[in-house]
Swiss-Prot record:
Residues 186-302, 393-434, 1090-1132 form a coiled coil. The gene is fhkB. The lineage of its organism: Eukaryota, Amoebozoa, Evosea, Eumycetozoa, Dictyostelia. Residues 1-16, 158-178, 374-397 have a biased composition (Polar residues). One of its GO terms (cellular component) is cytoplasm. Keywords: ATP-binding, Coiled coil, Kinase, Nucleotide-binding, Serine/threonine-protein kinase, Transferase. This is Probable serine/threonine-protein kinase fhkB. ATP binds at I631, G632, S633, G634, G635, Y636, G637, I638, V639, K654. It comes from Dictyostelium discoideum. Transmembrane segments: none annotated. Its EC number is 2.7.11.1. Belongs to the protein kinase superfamily. CAMK Ser/Thr protein kinase family. CHK2 subfamily. InterPro entries: Atg1-like, FHA_dom, Kinase-like_dom_sf, Prot_kinase_dom, Protein_kinase_ATP_BS, Ser/Thr_kinase_AS, SMAD_FHA_dom_sf. Residues 480-551 form the FHA domain. It is an enzyme of class 2 (transferase). Residues 1-359, 374-404, 432-451, 947-1142 are annotated as: Disordered.
Length: 1142
């Protein structure tokens, strides 16, 4: 330690002798210690009265000839007091002292004789450094800077002097030190700035209010209420702003009152020193120990600060390290000088308050402080009053100012956000007002179309290493031309000249020319199904090959991943393997043994069916298609999604197993003829047929693809009435086209109605028509078991009795589909008999809430489509002209307001078929149904025989009447009687008159004839009456047993009449003979004739009784059979209900 002190002393002596030299200064008169004490105390009191923001260097003025400042007892007391105060406050102020150690310096007791003016720049000498001994006239520190050249004053400091000349500052304009050192208070500036900002905001608000008022004046008087609300909101806003301003002013006044008190306390703690480092340097060994403790605390705090400031920039860290190195260097030099001299070495690069403002950097120059000098005089010959500089307090003030600024910024941001919210609310209100006036809002189209980016689909890797790979980065409409020409995108070199100038073109498969006429879909996934696939278009003369198969000039072919493209020859050198960026594992190659379609799919059956079709058909169309995946299955077979190899078009391939559906060779011939006609079908609302492939066991139909069906649309989305109207009209147009070709669907339901959705609406496609010819009638019923809702009544009746049905059965299915689409529930529940019968009888109810929004036109069309009798059902042409589509009220007047489809006599049989068919639910139910239906069929046969017998009896009666008329022609009297027979119901009185005019010989005969005529006419009436009743009862025979017995009685009467007529004809023959005898015999024969007539009547009665007994026996047998059938039917119902409940 001693060696270090000696080296420090030697170095300080050399530095002292080289840098310090004497200067001639005027001597000052000596001052007594009392006077010095008084001046010191006055200076101390004076310094406490000022609140300086920036620190100033201190110089103690003393007499250099008579006394030394270090021997003054007042100074020693002051040092001890300040040392104690600093030790208490060092922990709170050490952060600032570390930064200010490199820039602050103390000029205490520097004798004026030893300091040259050229060594101290004028910018670093402050008014507080000038001794105050030469100017005792003024109590305040008033001095003049008239002799300071303006060149030595920095530019940032000139604004404090307000000089009139460029060279010197007149002393008349400088009154005090406070006027020079202190700038305008920052808080006042901030207040002014805030006031200006508030004024600007108020002006902006006023302008906005004026604009809104102008807009509202143009609106209707309805806006008056909204204007009043806006005015109230504006008033509330202004009141809030005023309250905020008052609060801010109160806070500012409180801060101004608190700050001077805090500053005075800080001044009292360390009067006489600029910072803690000056205090340590000017003290002895005690100060050195304090300084070491202070360094240790600084190091601990620095470690904590480093943890907190990890997010700071690297530049700030570098600057801090440089400052710390400089500080350590200065401290080491100062400690070296302290061992040899009584005053430490200080850095002359101390920054004054004004130099801090300008942030000027000075070179590290060093001076010594002499221990012998007691006074210091300046070149100006003026003294300055000693002041205290609160350097530590400066940092705290800056922190407070920063906090205030942050608070003010936050408040301003909050105000701006509130204003923006209010403006948005006002704009929304104004837009609502304007929108109520205009019904349509103007929407601008997009200014620029979206920019398409090329997609990397893969590359063509050559097998021969001499060729270059071809990268396939393509847009949708791009084409890569491959060939030998220089204009080709991919130029190839061929020594054998097998490559054409333009050999082939490669483009994306989702840019098909055949699909350009189709508008863009809303759901663009359907348009991009072929995304990632390529098409090769052969335009060469020698040909292009894919996997060894020739494409052909002008033809195209899909290029899949790992396919080999050969140019010129299949075994040539120019071969490329297509390495795709998209792996298409979903494409099934029938030649492979891998099933990647569906795990549950029987792949062997599909493969065998495919092989059989290719063997039996030389030009099999299935070779041109890929099987992609399974998309559906049903009673007919399985449906696959296919891909056309030539152009990548998507199709649907339907596979039907003919052996499973029970088809024969004859039916296949009929089907082939039918589907050859279907190939020519081309309508926008009907699925298009592309090709049909037959084999002995299977059949493949290649048709247009449409994956969405109407059932999913109605289940997932809410479709309005206008869209349903378009769908229904397209259905009617499609069926009108099919019916004109003689094609009947008979199995229409929402699952068979496919659609594609476009921007303009829905495009409907009718599918699965004509496929029922592949299935037998029994299989047809089993296949569609449980879906009688969409079957027309005549279709079900045709399956039972083969009575035939017409084209109107499809209209029934359209009506049920329309009903379901409008209200989203079925028109009737098949399991509920009451509701089912009410629907069948024509009682359609539209009482649900969902029907309240449906128009009357739609309801009327549903009523006309759902009519039981097909003859009274609306036709397609009438439906297309319905007012629901035409919206013509004149046409609607032709229809009745309340239309009810009453069940006609013909439709009663259809109702019977529906009552039986609703029990058909499963295979077991179908077997029971067949037994039940056989009983029904036998009953129907019995009734049909009775119906035929009645018709035959009517014919016999007519013949007998004709014979009577011919026999009566032989006699004039009988002719008269026959005339009476023909007109008996109308002219009975005339007949009586004619009888009186006849001879007395024939009166009895005439009377008998008259009686016969009456009875005959009566019998004819009875016969006609019975015939009508028979028909009525025959239709209701299966329902009511009582009616069946009633029918039995009527049949008895009918047979009685028939026998009576037959006997009566015989009597007429006798009468004719009697009449002839009357012409030749006497009047006595009349009695004989009367007796004969009576006998004949008796015989007739006997015969009638015998016939009645015979017929009664027959009817009893029939009744027994029918009762047995009814009992069997009841037992079937009981068994079936028990089976279903279990």
């Amino acid at each position: 330690m001693s060696q270090d002190i000696q080296t420090q002393n030697s170095y300080s002596d050399e530095l002292y002798s080289s840098q310090i030299y004497s200067t001639q200064q005027p001597q000052q008169p000596q001052q007594q210690p009392q006077q010095q004490q008084s001046t010191f105390s006055s200076q101390q009191s004076q310094s406490s009265s000022y609140d300086f923001i920036y620190s100033t260097p201190q110089i103690h003025s003393q007499n250099s000839q008579n006394s030394q400042f270090s021997q003054n007892p007042l100074y020693d007391d002051f040092i001890h007091s300040t040392q104690n105060s600093y030790s208490q406050r060092v922990s709170s102020q050490r952060s600032y002292s570390q930064k200010s150690s490199s820039s602050q310096i103390s000029f205490s007791q520097i004798p004026s004789s030893q300091i040259q003016s050229s060594q101290i720049p004028s910018s670093q000498i402050h008014s507080s450094q000038i001794p105050s001994s030469q100017n005792q006239s003024s109590q305040k520190s008033q001095f003049s800077f008239s002799q300071i050249p303006s060149s030595q004053i920095p530019s940032s400091q000139k604004r404090f002097f307000q000089s009139q000349n460029d060279d010197f500052v007149p002393s008349s304009q400088v009154t005090s030190l406070q006027d020079i050192c202190l700038p305008q208070p920052i808080q006042q500036q901030q207040q002014q700035q805030q006031q200006q900002q508030q004024q600007q905001q108020q002006q902006q608000q006023q302008q906005q209010q004026q604009q809104q008022q102008q807009q509202q004046q143009q609106c209707q008087p309805q806006q008056q209420q909204t204007q009043q609300q806006q005015q109230q909101q504006q008033q509330q806003q202004q009141q809030q702003q005023q309250q905020q301003q008052q609060q801010q002013q109160q806070q500012q006044t409180q801060q101004q009152q608190q700050q001077p008190q805090e500053d005075d306390d800080d001044y009292d703690d360390y009067d006489g020193y600029d910072n803690y480092e000056d205090f340590v340097y000017n003290e002895g060994e005690e100060g050195e120990e304090d300084y070491e403790d202070y360094e240790q605390e600084n190091d601990d705090d620095d470690d904590e600060d480093e943890d907190d400031d990890d997010d700071d920039d690297d530049d700030d860290d570098d600057e801090e390290e440089e400052e710390e190195s400089q500080q350590q260097h200065i401290r080491s030099r100062a400690l070296q000088s302290r061992s040899s001299q009584s005053r430490p070495l200080l850095r002359s690069g101390f920054k004054s308050p004004i130099s801090r403002l300008s942030q000027t950097k000075t070179s590290p120059e060093y001076i010594y402080i002499s221990s012998q000098s007691n006074t210091h005089t300046n070149q100006l010959g003026q003294s300055s009053q000693q002041t205290n500089s609160p350097n530590v307090h400066f940092n705290s003030l800056q922190q407070k100012k920063k906090q205030q600024q942050q608070q003010q910024q936050q408040q301003q941001q909050q105000q701006q956000q509130q204003q923006q919210q209010q403006q948005q609310q006002q704009q929304q209100q104004s837009q609502q007002i304007i929108g109520s006036q205009s019904s349509q809002s103007s929407q601008l189209p997009p200014t620029q179309p979206p920019v398409e980016v090329p997609v990397n689909l893969g590359r063509l890797i050559p097998i021969n290493a001499s060729h270059i790979p071809i990268n396939l980065n393509l847009k949708r409409e791009d084409r890569i031309v491959v060939g030998r020409s220089s204009s080709c995108d991919a130029r190839l070199i061929d020594n054998y000249l097998t490559i054409s100038g333009k050999h082939c073109e490669i483009y994306r498969a989702d840019n098909l020319t055949c699909l350009k006429h189709i508008p863009l879909c809303k759901d663009k996934t359907d348009c991009h199904k072929n995304f990632g696939m390529l098409i090769v278009h052969d335009i060469s003369s020698n040909g292009s090959y894919i996997n060894g198969e020739l494409i052909g000039n002008g033809k195209t072919r899909i290029l899949r991943s790992d396919d080999i493209l050969s140019l010129g020859h299949p075994s040539g050198d120019l071969k490329f393997i297509f390495e795709s960026e998209f792996q298409f594992n979903f494409i099934l190659d029938i030649k492979d043994n891998v099933n990647n379609l569906n795990e549950n799919l029987d792949y062997k059956k599909l493969r065998t069916a495919y092989d059989n079709a290719r063997i039996e058909n030389k030009n099999c169309a299935l070779r041109d298609y890929y099987f992609v995946k399974e998309i559906g299955s049903g009673g007919y077979g399985i449906v696959y999604e296919g891909l056309y190899k030539l152009n990548g078009k998507r199709v649907a391939i339907k596979h039907i197993d003919l052996l499973k559906n029970g088809s024969t060779s004859k039916s296949m011939e009929l089907v082939s003829k039918e589907y050859n006609a279907l190939k020519n079908i081309k309508h926008r609302n009907v699925i298009e047929f592309f090709d049909i492939v037959f084999s002995s066991t299977d059949c493949f139909f290649i048709v247009e693809l449409a994956t969405n069906d109407l059932s999913n649309l109605l289940r997932k989305r809410c479709v309005d009435e206008d869209d349903i109207k378009r769908i229904c009209k397209q259905l009617l147009l499609g069926f009108n086209y099919l019916h004109n070709l003689g094609i009947v669907h008979r199995d229409l339901k929402p699952e068979n109605i496919l659609y594609n959705e476009f921007k303009q609406g829905f495009s409907i496609k009718i599918t699965d028509f004509g496929l029922s010819s592949f299935v037998e009638e029994s299989q047809y019923l089993q296949t569609f078991c449980g879906t009688p809702l969409f079957f027309a009544p005549e279709v079900i009746a045709n399956n039972f009795f083969s009575n035939g049905y017409g084209k109107s059965c499809d209209l029934w299915s359209i009506g049920v589909t329309l009903y379901l689409s409008l209200c989203k529930y079925k028109p009737f529940i098949v399991d509920c008999r009451d509701l089912y019968h009410s629907f069948i009888n024509g009682n359609l109810g539209f009482t649900s809430k969902k029907w309240a929004k449906i128009s009357n036109y739609a309801k009327d069309l549903v009523r006309r489509l759902l009519v039981i009798d097909p003859e009274h059902r609306i036709t397609i042409k009438e439906a297309l002209n319905h007012p629901w589509f035409t919206q013509d009220r004149r046409f609607f007047k032709k229809y009745p307001k309340h239309y009810k489809s009453r069940a006609q006599p013909k439709t009663q049989f259809f109702v019977e078929c529906f009552n039986v068919y609703y029990d058909l639910k499963s295979e077991t139910g179908f077997i029971c149904f067949r037994e039940h239906f056989d009983n029904l069929e036998t009953n129907y046969a019995l009734f049909k025989q009775n119906f035929d017998n009645n018709n035959n009896n009517n014919n016999n009666n007519n013949n007998n009447n004709n014979n009577n008329n011919n026999n009566n022609n032989n006699n004039n009297n009988i002719n008269n009687n026959n005339n009476n027979i023909n007109n008996n119901n109308i002219n009975n009185n005339n007949n009586n008159n004619n009888n009186n005019n006849n001879n007395t010989n024939t009166n009895n005969i005439n009377n008998n004839n008259n009686n016969y005529n009456n009875s005959h006419n009566h019998n004819n009436n009875n016969h006609n009456h019975n015939h009508n009743l028979n028909n009525h009862n025959h239709n209701n025979n299966h329902h009511h047993n009582h009616n069946h017995n009633h029918n039995h009685n009527h049949n008895h009467n009918h047979n009685h009449n028939h026998n009576h007529n037959h006997n009566h004809n015989h009597n007429n023959h006798n009468n004719n003979n009697n009449n002839n005898n009357n012409n030749n015999n006497n009047n006595n024969n009349n009695n004989n004739n009367n007796n004969n007539n009576n006998n004949n009547n008796n015989n007739n009665n006997n015969n009638n009784n015998n016939n009645n007994n015979y017929y009664n026996n027959n009817i009893n047998n029939i009744n027994n059979n029918i009762n047995n059938n009814i009992n069997n039917n009841n037992n079937y119902h009981q068994q079936y209900t028990q089976h279903t409940t279990m």
